[in-house]
Amino acid sequence: MIVDHSQIPEDTAVGQIAALEKDLFGRGAWSEQSVRQEFHAPARTYLLDIEGDAVQTADPVVRGYAGYWYDGDDAEIMTIGVGRPYQRQGIAAALLETLIVSARRQGAKRMLLEVRVDNVPALALYERFGFTRMGLRKRYYQPERHRRVHHEPR
């Protein structure tokens, strides 16, 4: 079930997202403080995929999360992550589709994102949704790691 991050206790969302970040992204993971700052930053939208109707329980389980920043013309995807046990079940696609719909409702003319060139599953997902490559930022993550910049067709 996809919900706005505000529908579950903030400490729960922050803690679970930070734990997922650490597992998924290692040294590049967002800390709890970074997640909390993103939640409170202006013009941000964050969505969570939670297990079942867990929003009604005391301990909802966050399976995946995604967010974007909208500046009045473009929306930029800040992050998408899905816990390893829940990957390859369509959660990332559902989150991405919901982000795109939300950004368009706000008036975004296009959606931008950046992704590591070696993140093959993410690249396939974005291409399936019609995102195209705009460029390459060399050594963005580390000296040997590059990142592609994509945008959704208008």
Where are these regions (language model features)?
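Short glycine/proline-centered loop/turn elements that form peptide/ligand docking sites
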Residues: 96, 119-122, 139-144
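Conserved active-site tyrosine of GNAT-family acetyltransferases
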Residues: 21, 126, 131, 151
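Residue-level recognition of the GNAT/N-acetyltransferase active site
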Residues: 83, 87, 114-118, 143
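Conserved beta-strand segments that form the floor/walls of ligand-binding pockets within enzyme
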Residues: 76, 81, 112-114, 135, ...
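Acetyl-CoA-dependent GNAT
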Residues: 1-89, 96-106, 154
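Conserved GNAT acetyl-CoA-binding A-motif
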Residues: 103-114, 137
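Conserved catalytic-core motifs of GNAT/GCN5-like acyltransferases
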Residues: 33, 114, 132-148
